From Swiss-Prot:
Changing M77A: Loss of activity on Nav1.2. The presence of a 'disulfide through disulfide knot' structurally defines this protein as a knottin. This is Beta-hexatoxin-Mg1a. Belongs to the neurotoxin 15 family. 01 (magi-5) subfamily. It comes from Macrothele gigas (Japanese funnel web spider).
């Protein structure tokens, strides 16, 4: 049972080392990844663009809500 926890700790340590390791041009190795996440984060999208409404969006009926969400009290809520 110690193997999964040890693997998780090693992976997290590697990520923290990579994050802190300076790159010659950008300052750290994961700067580009951080920029990509920041620029491509489109949540929450407008419901018209998505085709359905996400959790906690206002709704009128259950067919408007995405996935397992259901319209309850005028809000898309997880079931």
């Amino acid at each position: 049972m110690k193997a999964p926890a040890t693997t998780l700790i090693l992976v997290m340590s590697l990520i923290s080392v990579l994050w802190a390791t300076p790159d010659l041009e950008e300052g750290d190795l994961l700067a580009e990844l951080g920029d990509l996440i920041a620029t491509d984060d489109e949540y929450p999208m407008k419901p018209e663009e998505r085709g359905c409404k996400l959790t906690f969006w206002k709704c009128k009926n259950k067919k408007e809500c995405c996935g397992w969400n259901a319209c309850a009290l005028g809000i898309c809520m997880p079931r």
